[in-house]
């Protein structure tokens, strides 16, 4: 697509013209067709019981089928969730009783902090040990190095492997299929944090040999906040036990059905999703989010994102000590580019300066191995916005 076409596509996204938004990795803005779909809430407000009982079920099943098709999954194995945090906590509380004391939970050393805490809590309750494997750092030549680091850390006591498909702080893309294959060969349960993956990379969950995969829609897919999902392997559905007891619960203990029911789900999925009366309208907007990017071409969108990421790397690398930590290898990177900031950087001052003086929304992260600047480039971003960031960094360094 030519620049004019991308500019026209940008016009369809709800962006504040006063803000430079380089932060889809935290939360993406809504395309107007997606926002318009969320206004289905008006129908719920006008007739709540008619909407929830009669109108919602077919809409919910359609949304599930569309998301499943987009992810390469089967709809009966795909539970909606509010976000990845909730989905992973559901998995953790469900598998906890099945993890024998004395075993180990293996994580990468770059996991999102609340997810690490989640597994540390499981370990405390079950008498397990949490171990980490160190992800290789720049220069990182190939995905083989990641696989070697993970497999070297797996041992006879490893019971569960948890890792991010795309590392949230650096944008490093892990070879998820190969990691899950290695774990499966060793009888290790796999749970993948896919918060950054939908819309960021091409997904085929049916071909990914993991036991549980949790993802978000509010980042790169540009779906509303409140859209998450949990995909589970066929032999893992019976393990899942939601913390809440609501409609869908089977007091008789019988295995719930995986056939579509009249509620827009299956008996098993209803048990996982139902929390009493709640607003499911964000889930119903998923088809609109998929359609919007399909209209632009999913492949072309990802190509544009990578093009902007490459421009960002070239424009900012080496300037005043900025060092890219995201690999350049196409199999290990995508649309997020992280830069190591010079030692001693006042991260709070830089963060506030970028926003207060220049209205640039971009994360400045504090990490044990040094501060980072993380730049997310979606199709609606422009080279001019990256230049604006470069000029702001120059001004703030004076």
Curated annotation (Swiss-Prot):
Family note: Belongs to the class-V pyridoxal-phosphate-dependent aminotransferase family.
Q: Isomerase as a keyword?
A: yes
N6-(pyridoxal phosphate)lysine modification sites are: 219
SUPFAM superfamilies the record matches: PLP-dependent transferases
- Bias (Basic and acidic residues) occurs at 251-264
Q: Which PANTHER family match?
A: HERCYNYLCYSTEINE SULFOXIDE LYASE (PTHR43092:SF2), L-CYSTEINE DESULFHYDRASE (PTHR43092)
Region annotated Disordered, chain positions = 243-264
User: What's its top-level EC category?
Assistant: isomerase
**Name this protein carries in UniProt:** Isopenicillin N epimerase
Q: Which domain of life is it from?
A: Bacteria
Name its species: Amycolatopsis lactamdurans (Nocardia lactamdurans)
Write out the function statement from the record. Answer: Catalyzes the reversible isomerization between isopenicillin N and penicillin N.
């Amino acid at each position: 697509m030519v620049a004019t076409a991308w500019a026209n596509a940008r016009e369809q996204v709800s962006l504040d013209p006063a803000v430079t938004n380089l932060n889809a990795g935290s939360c993406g803005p809504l395309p107007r067709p997606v926002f318009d779909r969320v206004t289905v809430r008006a129908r719920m407000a006008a007739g709540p019981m008619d909407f929830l009982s009669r109108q919602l079920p077919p809409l919910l099943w359609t949304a599930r089928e569309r998301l499943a098709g987009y992810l390469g999954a089967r709809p009966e194995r795909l539970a909606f969730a509010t976000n990845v945090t909730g989905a992973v906590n559901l998995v953790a509380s469900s598998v906890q009783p099945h993890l024998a004391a004395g075993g180990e939970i293996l994580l990468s050393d770059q996991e999102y902090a609340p997810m690490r805490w989640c597994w540390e809590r499981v370990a405390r309750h079950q008498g397990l040990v949490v171990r980490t494997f160190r992800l290789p750092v720049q220069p990182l030549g190939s995905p083989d190095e990641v696989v070697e680091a993970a497999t070297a850390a797996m041992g006879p006591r490893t019971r569960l492997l948890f890792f991010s498909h795309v590392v949230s702080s650096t944008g490093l893309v892990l070879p998820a299929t190969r990691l899950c294959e290695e774990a499966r060969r060793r009888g290790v349960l796999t749970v993948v944090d896919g918060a950054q993956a939908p819309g960021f990379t091409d997904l085929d969950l049916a071909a990914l040999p993991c036991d549980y995969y949790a993802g978000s829609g509010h980042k790169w897919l540009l779906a509303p906040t409140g859209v998450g999902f949990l995909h589970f392997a066929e032999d893992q559905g019976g393990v899942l036990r939601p913390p809440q007891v609501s409609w869908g619960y089977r007091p008789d203990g019988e295995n719930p059905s995986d056939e579509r029911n009249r509620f827009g789900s299956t008996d098993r999925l209803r048990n996982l999703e139902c929390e009493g009366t709640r607003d499911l309208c964000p889930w119903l907007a998923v088809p609109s989010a998929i359609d919007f990017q399909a209209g632009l071409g999913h492949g072309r969108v990802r190509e544009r994102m990578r093009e902007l990421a490459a421009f960002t790397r070239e424009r900012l690398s080496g300037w005043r000590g900025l060092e890219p930590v995201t690999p350049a290898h196409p199999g290990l990177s995508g649309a997020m580019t992280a830069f190591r900031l010079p030692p001693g950087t006042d991260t709070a001052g830089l963060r506030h300066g970028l926003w207060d003086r220049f209205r640039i929304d971009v994360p400045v992260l504090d990490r044990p191995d040094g501060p980072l600047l993380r730049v997310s480039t979606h199709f609606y971003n422009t080279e001019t916005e990256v230049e604006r960031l470069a000029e702001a960094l120059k001004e703030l360094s004076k």
